[in-house]
Amino acid sequence: MEIEDKIRKAYEESVRVKEQFFRENISLIKEVAEIIAKSLNEGGKILIFGNGGSATDASHIAAEFVNRFKRERPGLPAIALNTDMAVLTAIANDYDYSEIFAKQVKALGESGDIVIGISTSGSSRNVIKAIEVAKKRGLKSIAFTSKKGEKLISKVDYAFAVPSEDTPRIQETHITLGHILCELVEDILFEIPAAKKKLKQ
């Protein structure tokens, strides 16, 4: 295959997957954005996590909430649980790698918080264990995964399953979803005067 054809095939497939995903999930995206905004407005926070490329997506999305996305506004509390090397290696060394997110959810998760687990395969044991802990503690849980992620999908309150088995296409859709959710949450919280008053300035 010529280089130009390979480039064209990659971006066309990326566009196709995203178009199908967002067409099928537009109502769910709106619902989840409202749930996240409600949690943040009532003093909750976001705990988000994943492995590898999904870890960088988690860090990226958390940064957009804590800093800003498109609006000048107060920071919103979001913690990527895959960023603290001391915590991660201590848990993995003393217990098991499958516990690295679950123990953090136990330590940091509080009533009203939102947990977002990102796994392209939907079978990452450490992500699934953390979701199980979140459910036991009464936290709302959201998954970013793919159509093959039945294990994770079955555990969460809200699941976003990308209609692809190609990891790059799945991850490209996940970060776009994260951006859209952040933009919607900003719009909800900072365009509604009543919500603005409740947030800590």
UniProtKB/Swiss-Prot annotation:
Similarity comment: Belongs to the SIS family. GmhA subfamily.
Organism annotation: Thermodesulfovibrio yellowstonii (strain ATCC 51303 / DSM 11347 / YP87)
Residues in the signal sequence: none
Domain SIS: 36-195
Binding site for substrate: 51-53, 64, 93-94, 119-121, 124, 171
UniProt EC number: 5.3.1.28
Protein name, entry field: Phosphoheptose isomerase
Entry's Gene Ontology BP terms: carbohydrate metabolic process; D-glycero-D-manno-heptose 7-phosphate biosynthetic process; positive regulation of DNA-templated DNA replication initiation
Localization annotation: Cytoplasm
Pfam families: SIS_2
Annotated keywords: Carbohydrate metabolism, Cytoplasm, Isomerase, Metal-binding, Zinc
Note: The reaction produces a racemic mixture of D-glycero-alpha-D-manno-heptose 7-phosphate and D-glycero-beta-D-manno-heptose 7-phosphate.
InterPro entries in the cross-refs: GmhA/DiaA, Phosphoheptose_Isoase, SIS_dom, SIS_dom_sf, SIS_GmhA/DiaA_subfam
Pathway, per record: Carbohydrate biosynthesis; D-glycero-D-manno-heptose 7-phosphate biosynthesis; D-glycero-alpha-D-manno-heptose 7-phosphate and D-glycero-beta-D-manno-heptose 7-phosphate from sedoheptulose 7-phosphate: step 1/1
CC cofactor note: Binds 1 zinc ion per subunit.
HAMAP family: GmhA
